[in-house]
Amino acid sequence: MSEKKDVRILAYESSCDETSTAVIKNGREIESLIVATQIKSHQRFGGVVPEVASRHHIEVVSQITKEALNEANCSWKDIDAIAVTYGPGLVGALLIGVSAAKAVSMATGIPLIGVDHIMGHIMAAQLKDEIEYPAIALQVSGGHTEIVLLKDPTHFEIIGDTRDDAAGEAYDKIGRVLGVNYPAGKTIDAWAHQGKDTFNFPRAMLEDDDYDFSFSGLKSAFINTCHHADQIHEKLNKYDLAASFQAAVIDVLAHKTIRAIKEYKPKTFIMGGGVAANQGLRDRMSEEIAKLPKADQPKVILPDLKLCGDNAAMIGAAAYNLYNGGQFADLTLNADPSLELPYAKSMLN
C-alpha cells in the first residue's frame, strides 16, 4: 500500500498592512513563513493608509514568493496548490495578493484556492494542534469580533458579531488618545497588567440573550473620561485607564463566549485574530473554561503569538481543508473586500 502523498500549498496574504507568503505541508506544518511588515510606514498616520499599503505589497510580493520557496527548499513542481486571501480586507491590498496568486497559477498550471481571511485566522489553531469538531472560535481583530461555530473544517457559522466597532479597532482608537503608537494592543495589554480597574467602564450587551458585541459605547466613555480630565487639568493614571478599558472588553468577550460554549458544547475552543495575542484575554478564557464541569470543558487551542497577526501560514492551513474538499477557484477569482462567513459549503461530511 503506497504512502499518502504530502500536500504542499504556497499561500499569499495581503488583506491589510502585512505582505506574507508561506509554504504549508499537509495543513499542519510550516515549512516557510515570510512576513514583510509595514507598521513603521503607517505609524505616523495613526493607522493603515490603504494606498500606502497597496504600494508596499507591490514592492515586495515577488521577492517574498521566492523567499518562501527557498526557505522551504521547494521548487514549483513540489507545490500542489496556490492559496490566496481574497477577502475581507482593503480592496487595493487584496488585489495585489490575488493578482500574484492568479499569475503564478496561470504560469505554472498549479490549482488556485481562494481563502476567506477570517477562516484563515481561525485555522491558525490547526498549525498548533488538531481541531476536534464541532468547535467554537472567538475571532477578535481590528476589523472583526465574532463567535463562530465550526461544524467541520470548511463549514463555519457566525453566531455572534459586533454591531459597530471591533475590539481591536477600539484598542487602537483609545491608544491614540493615550499617545500610544499604532498598533496599540500590545502596549495597552502591558499597561493593563500594571493598573487596576478603577473607572468602571460600561460592559455593553453583557446580559443580552444573543452573542453580539458592541464596543462603540465603551470607546466613547473612555474618550469622554480622558477629555473631561483634560478640561479640569486632572492627570489620570494611564495604567488604571488601560486596566479599566481592557477589563470591560474582556468581561464581555469571556462572558458571551463561555455562554456559547455551554449552549453548543464544542469539542474544541479556538481563539484567532490579532487580539488573540492579548495575554489578559488568553489567561481569562483559559481560567473560565477551567471552571466548567470537567465533562463540559472543550480542548483549548490558542495559536502561537506570531500566528495571531496577519500571515500566510494560516491561509495555507485553511486552504488545505478546502483542497481536501475539492474547493478550487478559477482565474476569474477577484478580491471581495466585504466577504463574509459562511461562504464555503461543507464537502467533508
UniProtKB/Swiss-Prot annotation:
<feature type="binding site">
    <location>
        <position position="172"/>
    </location>
    <ligand>
        <name>substrate</name>
    </ligand>
</feature>
<comment type="similarity">
    <text>Belongs to the KAE1 / TsaD family.</text>
</comment>
<feature type="binding site">
    <location>
        <position position="117"/>
    </location>
    <ligand>
        <name>Fe cation</name>
    </ligand>
</feature>
<feature type="binding site">
    <location>
        <begin position="139"/>
        <end position="143"/>
    </location>
    <ligand>
        <name>substrate</name>
    </ligand>
</feature>
<dbReference type="GO" id="GO:0061711">
    <property type="term" value="F:N(6)-L-threonylcarbamoyladenine synthase activity"/>
</dbReference>
<dbReference type="GO" id="GO:0002949">
    <property type="term" value="P:tRNA threonylcarbamoyladenosine modification"/>
</dbReference>
<dbReference type="InterPro" id="IPR000905">
    <property type="entry name" value="Gcp-like_dom"/>
</dbReference>
<keyword id="KW-0408">Iron</keyword>
<keyword id="KW-0012">Acyltransferase</keyword>
<keyword id="KW-0808">Transferase</keyword>
<dbReference type="GO" id="GO:0005506">
    <property type="term" value="F:iron ion binding"/>
</dbReference>
<keyword id="KW-0479">Metal-binding</keyword>
<keyword id="KW-0819">tRNA processing</keyword>
<feature type="binding site">
    <location>
        <position position="278"/>
    </location>
    <ligand>
        <name>substrate</name>
    </ligand>
</feature>
<dbReference type="InterPro" id="IPR017861">
    <property type="entry name" value="KAE1/TsaD"/>
</dbReference>
<feature type="binding site">
    <location>
        <position position="121"/>
    </location>
    <ligand>
        <name>Fe cation</name>
    </ligand>
</feature>
<comment type="function">
    <text>Required for the formation of a threonylcarbamoyl group on adenosine at position 37 (t(6)A37) in tRNAs that read codons beginning with adenine. Is involved in the transfer of the threonylcarbamoyl moiety of threonylcarbamoyl-AMP (TC-AMP) to the N6 group of A37, together with TsaE and TsaB. TsaD likely plays a direct catalytic role in this reaction.</text>
</comment>
<feature type="binding site">
    <location>
        <position position="185"/>
    </location>
    <ligand>
        <name>substrate</name>
    </ligand>
</feature>
<keyword id="KW-0963">Cytoplasm</keyword>
<feature type="binding site">
    <location>
        <position position="310"/>
    </location>
    <ligand>
        <name>Fe cation</name>
    </ligand>
</feature>
<feature type="binding site">
    <location>
        <position position="189"/>
    </location>
    <ligand>
        <name>substrate</name>
    </ligand>
</feature>
<protein>
    <recommendedName>
        <fullName>tRNA N6-adenosine threonylcarbamoyltransferase</fullName>
        <ecNumber>2.3.1.234</ecNumber>
    </recommendedName>
</protein>
<dbReference type="Pfam" id="PF00814">
    <property type="entry name" value="TsaD"/>
</dbReference>
<dbReference type="InterPro" id="IPR022450">
    <property type="entry name" value="TsaD"/>
</dbReference>
<dbReference type="GO" id="GO:0005737">
    <property type="term" value="C:cytoplasm"/>
</dbReference>
<dbReference type="InterPro" id="IPR043129">
    <property type="entry name" value="ATPase_NBD"/>
</dbReference>
